[in-house]
């Protein structure tokens, strides 16, 4: 285990730091497993497994693999889908975007070198037998004794001798549902026995990387693990092979707890936030992209998987329908320049009711449809009703929330509020999408009922937008009651609210010592108000409904605040 200490320490840090994106997936994985067991032709599976053991594979072999992958993908609910992610200044700072672009480029070069060729998207060993023999002859002529191609320990190189190497991309990698189905059907085991065996392996994985010795010991207690291969994992090995790494990935899904990275789900609405958190953990722990060809370290592996799709289950879902590589599907736009800060209007002024761009208006409508009009719904704002700078709507039963910002009209009042209340900085709101708060309020369901700590400001905000049909219930907590769970909420969910960077000072009574305080974040306030009313902090993880890129104006947006 000593060799794995630095690497596993990174894994543990990533598990802790990204816990808000991990999910209990055991039920979902087993649901897909049962679908595969009932409908998959395991004779075809056996033929694919036989094919990948061949030393040389051809176009017809690749066609069989891709057809098999399509059948598996059609039977599974857990999958990643094709999505192009373009990150701009706003959700991430320019320095963070530059860091991400650099890491993706380093990763591209490393993967390319590892796969053995100069062109991206081509896997190691994509040489014909004739080319391999010519290479060996060249090495011998240069004095290298016993020259033979690098490969397995027996010296055998397994190659894909095909016309279009890009067809290999994303056709490999194990899927827990498929691994469990193969262990059950081909191992002649009961599904429950396989689940119990993998659960034991998963518990071990919470404290270390399981190795072959561990596998042998666990096999004595769980015979279902006997089917796991003792051969080392290699590149371009299909997800139908029952390797130790495939078993460990499946085992991670059997542990509903432990914040396993394998259980991360990526959604477009939280992609930028996830990347931001990943970069923060990387810098805090001193993680890096290694230049040495070979297996990816935990940071490299997670970065690649997240950036490959940005929509789905990066570790455990079917990804055969995804085209391209991580650096193809996630790009950084550093050319977008921050919009000029608009001059403030004296003495505030009413919010501008101009419409936002059509595509963002559609996104707002889709996001609001994710809310349940009949469920308990908290709302809070920072700023004044006629000049709000932040708004949050939160439904504790599902964890769904809508959270956005707005650049203020009254700069002087804003700075005063920042100093004594919310801690937001003017420069961080310069690119906030104008008209977003108005658009959200305009599209809220008719007669929806909201819960708030202090209803006057919310009612005035609704009335200014002509929404007298919306109702607000005031819980009327005291200042101390409202913030009973403040420290716990900030400790658990601080990564959801990254704009409140300013120093907040408690308003002191005459003669009292001046002290600092936590800033008031509209989103975290709604969560802590709910905790006070219910008496506990809910386990339900907050889930963003409004994509983070919608919060910031495009470079072409010319709508004034």
Curated annotation (Swiss-Prot):
It is an enzyme of class 3 (hydrolase). Mn(2+) binds at residues 380, 382, 525. Residues 52-237 are annotated as: Binding site for the cap structure m7GTP. Keywords: Capsid protein, Helical capsid protein, Host cytoplasm, Host-virus interaction, Hydrolase, Inhibition of host IKBKE by virus, Inhibition of host innate immune response by virus, Inhibition of host RLR pathway by virus, Interferon antiviral system evasion, Manganese, Metal-binding, Ribonucleoprotein, RNA-binding, Viral immunoevasion, Viral nucleoprotein, Virion, Zinc. GO terms for cellular component: helical viral capsid; host cell cytoplasm; ribonucleoprotein complex; viral nucleocapsid. Its EC number is 3.1.13.-. Zn(2+) binds at residues 390, 497, 500, 521. One of its GO terms (biological process) is negative stranded viral RNA replication. Residues 336-355 are annotated as: Disordered. GO terms for molecular function: hydrolase activity; metal ion binding; RNA binding. It is found in: Virion; Host cytoplasm. Gene3D superfamilies: Arenaviral nucleoprotein, C-terminal domain (3.30.420.410), Arenavirus nucleocapsid protein, head domain (1.10.150.550). InterPro entries: Nucleocapsid_arenaviridae, Nucleocapsid_C_arenaviridae, Nucleocapsid_C_sf, Nucleocapsid_N_arenaviridae. Homomultimerizes to form the nucleocapsid. Binds to viral genomic RNA. Interacts with glycoprotein G2. Interacts with protein Z; this interaction probably directs the encapsidated genome to budding sites. Interacts with protein L; this interaction does not interfere with Z-L interaction. Interacts with host IKBKE (via Protein kinase domain); the interaction inhibits IKBKE kinase activity. The N-terminal region is important for the cap-binding activity while the C-terminal region contains the 3'-5' exoribonuclease activity. A CCHE zinc binding site is present in the C-terminal region and may thus contribute to the substrate binding and/or the specificity of the exonuclease activity. Encapsidates the genome, protecting it from nucleases. The encapsidated genomic RNA is termed the nucleocapsid (NC). Serves as template for viral transcription and replication. The increased presence of protein N in host cell does not seem to trigger the switch from transcription to replication as observed in other negative strain RNA viruses. Belongs to the arenaviridae nucleocapsid protein family. This is Nucleoprotein. It comes from Pichinde mammarenavirus.
